[in-house]
């Protein structure tokens, strides 16, 4: 299934980082904070937005923004470009 965001929205896939305590215990998903890093999977019409974002870019976004959806058992978020706080460059 292909999802194309409308307007100045992005489809992002949260980057899950494994969390361990100092003692080496892996925390379950329910004990983790919401991820704030994601990879852009699809972009809407960003002509009016003054941003340089493309598919494959990694970004930091506001913690409780966007709409969470599932596509083929994978978690994604549809988010407004204004809720993107920063672009991560490696």
UniProtKB/Swiss-Prot annotation:
What's a Pfam family this protein contains?
Cpn10
**Record's keyword annotation contains ATP-binding:** no
Q: Which GO terms describe its molecular function?
A: ATP binding; metal ion binding; protein folding chaperone; protein-folding chaperone binding; unfolded protein binding
Q: Does the keyword Chaperone apply?
A: yes
- Report the main location listed first in the record: cytoplasm
GO cellular component entries: cytoplasm
Q: What is the protein's known function?
A: Together with the chaperonin GroEL, plays an essential role in assisting protein folding. The GroEL-GroES system forms a nano-cage that allows encapsulation of the non-native substrate proteins and provides a physical environment optimized to promote and accelerate protein folding. GroES binds to the apical surface of the GroEL ring, thereby capping the opening of the GroEL channel.
Complex and partners: Heptamer of 7 subunits arranged in a ring. Interacts with the chaperonin GroEL.
* UniProt-annotated location(s): Cytoplasm
| Name of the protein this chain belongs to | Co-chaperonin GroES
What GO terms in the biological process aspect are recorded for it? chaperone cofactor-dependent protein refolding
Q: Which UniProt keywords apply?
A: Chaperone, Cytoplasm
The family annotation for this protein states: Belongs to the GroES chaperonin family.
Protein's gene: groES
């Amino acid at each position: 299934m292909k999802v194309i965001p409308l307007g100045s929205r992005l489809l992002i896939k949260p980057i899950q980082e494994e969390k361990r305590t100092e003692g080496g215990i892996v925390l379950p998903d329910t004990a983790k904070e919401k991820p704030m890093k994601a990879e852009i999977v699809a972009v809407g019409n960003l002509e009016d937005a003054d941003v340089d974002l493309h598919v494959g870019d990694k970004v930091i976004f506001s913690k409780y923004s966007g709409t969470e959806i599932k596509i083929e058992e994978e978690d994604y978020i549809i988010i407004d470009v204004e809720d993107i706080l920063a672009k991560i460059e490696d």
